[in-house]
């Protein structure tokens, strides 16, 4: 997989992790390759589909995908747990027409991760990662905020995959319980060969 030029940044997104974050946080926010592969090095990963639906693209997400705000998009929201601990909510979206075309596989994943269709296709390119602290009114914030949130910062990353000129925006955030888990274990697992792809 090759890396594509990043679209103009939407407000709040950063091309580098701020210095206030720990090395472990910076590692996970900009870790290359499939995130699920990294999570599996920490424990048993389970994926639950929270929602699949059509909506209008927000200004923030539309800018990342180079489409007009309000354009119809297909959204898939999931929650990944590690050893039973809710760890990583993820939100993926693509133009509605692309969900029946270039990215139609997104509709057939069920409980399989997006990596199953992204990292085996040489025709797919990906933008560099950007990160930010989640806040309202971002759509991802409403989905990702855990019921027992203690007020601590929730950091997210996102990138855009491109196939046949069609974007697929993938955002992932790391919940406070995830950081507690990696702090207790090996905070920065070594990358395996198949994880080193950009």
Swiss-Prot record:
Keywords: Cytoplasm, Lyase, Pyruvate, Ubiquinone biosynthesis. It is an enzyme of class 4 (lyase). GO terms for cellular component: cytosol. It catalyses: chorismate = 4-hydroxybenzoate + pyruvate. Its EC number is 4.1.3.40. GO terms for molecular function: chorismate lyase activity. It is found in: Cytoplasm. Coiled coil: none annotated. One of its GO terms (biological process) is ubiquinone biosynthetic process. InterPro entries: Chorismate--pyruvate_lyase, Chorismate_lyase_/UTRA_dom_sf. Pathway: Cofactor biosynthesis; ubiquinone biosynthesis. Substrate binds at residues 76, 114, 172. Removes the pyruvyl group from chorismate, with concomitant aromatization of the ring, to provide 4-hydroxybenzoate (4HB) for the ubiquinone pathway. Belongs to the UbiC family. This is Probable chorismate pyruvate-lyase. It comes from Bordetella avium (strain 197N). The lineage of its organism: Bacteria, Pseudomonadati, Pseudomonadota, Betaproteobacteria, Burkholderiales.
């Amino acid at each position: 997989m090759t890396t594509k030029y990043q679209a103009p940044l939407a407000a709040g997104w950063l091309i580098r992790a701020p210095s206030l974050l720990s090395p472990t946080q910076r590692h996970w926010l900009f870790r290359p390759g499939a995130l699920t592969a990294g999570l599996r090095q920490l424990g048993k990963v389970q994926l639950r589909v929270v929602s699949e639906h059509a909506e209008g693209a927000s200004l923030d997400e539309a800018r990342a995908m180079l489409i007009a705000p309000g354009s119809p998009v297909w959204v898939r929201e999931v929650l990944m747990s590690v050893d039973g601990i809710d760890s990583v909510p993820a939100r993926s979206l693509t133009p509605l027409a692309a969900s029946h075309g270039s990215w139609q596989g997104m509709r057939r994943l069920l409980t399989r991760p997006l990596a199953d269709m992204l990292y085996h296709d040489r025709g797919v390119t990906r933008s560099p990662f950007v990160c930010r602290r989640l806040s309202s009114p971002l759509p991802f914030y409403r989905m990702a905020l855990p019921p027992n949130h203690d007020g601590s910062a929730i950091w997210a990353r996102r990138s855009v995959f491109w196939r046949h000129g069609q974007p697929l925006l993938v955002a992932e955030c790391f919940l406070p319980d995830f950081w507690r888990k990696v702090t207790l274990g090996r905070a920065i697992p070594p990358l395996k060969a198949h994880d080193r792809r950009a």
